[in-house]
């Protein structure tokens, strides 16, 4: 079974991991694939106005309908959001992590569900207790979007299920070796 099928990760992400890329490089590629990079404001799956790779604030101000940014400004916003997510992981996750693990946790916890939902989560308790497999299992439980069960394809959010599988694969990268 090839790695793409086994982990659901793109060839680009797997190549970065294989080349020993840093967490910011892996996270940038992963988020580009999952979030896209929109220079015009749009509503996310829960109706929140976002821009670039899902940012809800630009220069401290909320994203509003009709907001447009240059690609260069989105690159700047994306770098700030990426760095904040990775800094959150460094500060709050108490076990040693590899770069792929940092990227997976940064995508899941601070970037996607937010710290407010992460801190009380089973994932957070398990990872900091050293139960890596249990933590990675708990990532896969976060498959609702705006109250919709994303396992039901007609709810049009099945990408959330795939994303959680991929974040889980990254967060547990290498623990079976």
Swiss-Prot record:
Its EC number is 3.2.1.17. GO terms for biological process: cell wall macromolecule catabolic process; defense response to bacterium; killing of cells of another organism; peptidoglycan catabolic process. It is found in: Host cell inner membrane. It holds the Pfam family Phage_lysozyme. GO terms for molecular function: lysozyme activity. One of its GO terms (cellular component) is host cell plasma membrane. Signal-arrest-release (SAR) endolysin with lysozyme activity that degrades host peptidoglycans and participates with the pinholin and spanin proteins in the sequential events which lead to programmed host cell lysis releasing the mature viral particles. Once the pinholin has permeabilized the host cell membrane, the SAR-endolysin is released into the periplasm where it breaks down the peptidoglycan layer. This is SAR-endolysin. It comes from Enterobacteria phage H19B.
